[in-house]
Amino acid sequence: MKKVLTNIKLRAAFILGCIILSLSIQAQNTVIKAGHLFDSRTGKFLDDQILIIKQGRILQTGSNLKYEKNDIVIDLANSWVLPGLMDCHVHITSNYPYRKISALSDIYTTESSGFRALRGAYNAELLLKSGFTTIKDIGNDANYATADVIKAIREGWIKGPTIFYSGKIIAPYGGQTGGINPENEGLWKFEYLDADTDDEIIKAIRKNIYFGANTIKIVQGDQQYFYTEQNIRTAANEAHRAGVKLTCHVFEGEAARNVILGGADAIEHGLFLEDSLLQMMKDRGMFLVGTDLAYNNIYAYGGDSAGAKQMSDRIIDRLKRAYKIGTKMAFGTDVIIDLPGKNRVESNLEILKNWKAAGIPSSYVLQTMTVYAAELLGIDKNRGVLEKNYVADIIALKNNPVENIDAIKKVHFVMKDGEVIKNE
C-alpha cells in the first residue's frame, strides 16, 4: 500500500512540476535589444531601443526597459531593426517564360492549379524569410491556387507571410487576353471572371469572396472597352459592404478617371497617369501602388532594349511626379517573370533601381513598405509600426537602409507574429 501511495505522490509531483514549468515558459517574454529601431511614422531610426514581446504582440518599447531574468533575449544591438516589410502587388503562383510573354495564355493549358499552388508556397516562404511579412497577391493564380497556399500557412504546414488575396481577376469580356481564336473562346476564364454589367460585377465579387478573397481586383482599360464610373462605384460599394478593399489595374486616361471618381481604394500601376489624375488621387486620399518595374524586369517580357528603356524612363517620370504631388503610395512589385539567376525576391527588388533613379528618399521608400502599406491594407492599427500592442512582425538588417535602400536585400533576422523565423 505504501508503495502505491509513493507512486501516486511521485506522479502527482511530476505532473505538478510539468504544470509549473509550462506556466514558467508561458510567462517568458521575448526581449529584443535593437541598436537602431525604425520609427516608420517619422522615417527615422532611434538608437539603443528595447522591445518586449508577449504572445505575439509588442508589450513595451523604449530605452532602459527592465525585464525578467528568465525572458528570452535577442541581441540585435549591431543591427537596424524595422517592422516587417509589405509588398502590395505580387503574383506568387506565376512565373511566365523569360522574354516569351506572348506565351502567357499557354500557361492556362500547361500548369495545373495544384502546380501553381506549390510554386506559391515556395515563393511565400521565400518572401517571408526575406523580410516580407505581409503581401497582397492579386490574381493570375489559376483556379484559386493562392487560397490553398493561405490554407497551408494557416494549418502550419508551411511558413509564410500574412496574405491579402483577390481571387480571380474581374474584367470586361476577355480579361487581359488578346488574339484568342473563337474556337478557344473563354480560355481566359482559367484566371479571370468576365463581368460586363453591374449585376455581373456584384456576382463576381461575391464569388471571389466565397472562395477566399479578402481584397478585390478589377482590370480596367486593357481592352478597347472599359468600365464606367458607375460600374466602378458598384464594385466599390459591394466590396466595402463585404469589408474588403477595391483596387483597380489601370494605366491612364478616362479609364483611370472612372476608377478615381468611382471610389476605388487604390490604383495598381498607373504608369502613365497625368498630373491632374495624381492630384485627384491625393485629394481623395487614394493610394497608388505603382509597380515601378525596372529596365531588367520590363526587358524580361520580350521586345527590344530601346522599348524597355523608354518604358522604364516613363515609369521613373511618373514616380517623380507622384512623389512631388504627394499622392499616397504603397510599395508593390508585380514581378511575374523571374530574372535569370535570380529568385522571386531578388527579381522583385530590381525595382528599387527606379525608386533611386527618381530620387525618392530611402526613408520614404521604407514607409511605403511599412506604415503606408498597412494603411492601404486596412491593418494600420495592428501592423506597420513597432509600438505597444502592435503585432510583432520584425526584421533586422546589417546595414542602414536609410543610407542605402539596397540594405533591405540582406535580411538576417525575421520575426512573424512573435515567432522567430530566421536569425543568422
Located regions from the model:
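Active-site core of metal-dependent hydrolases
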Residues: 173, 218-317, 335-342, 359, ...
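His/Asp/Glu-enriched, well-ordered alpha-helical/loop segment
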Residues: 105-106, 314-400
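Active-site gating loops and adjacent loop-to-helix segments of metal-dependent hydrolytic enzymes
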Residues: 93-115, 173-190, 283-312, 326, ...
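Metal-associated gating/positioning segment near the N- to mid-region
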Residues: 80-151, 155-157, 230, 259-262
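Histidine-rich, glycine-flanked metal-binding segment
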Residues: 37, 42-82
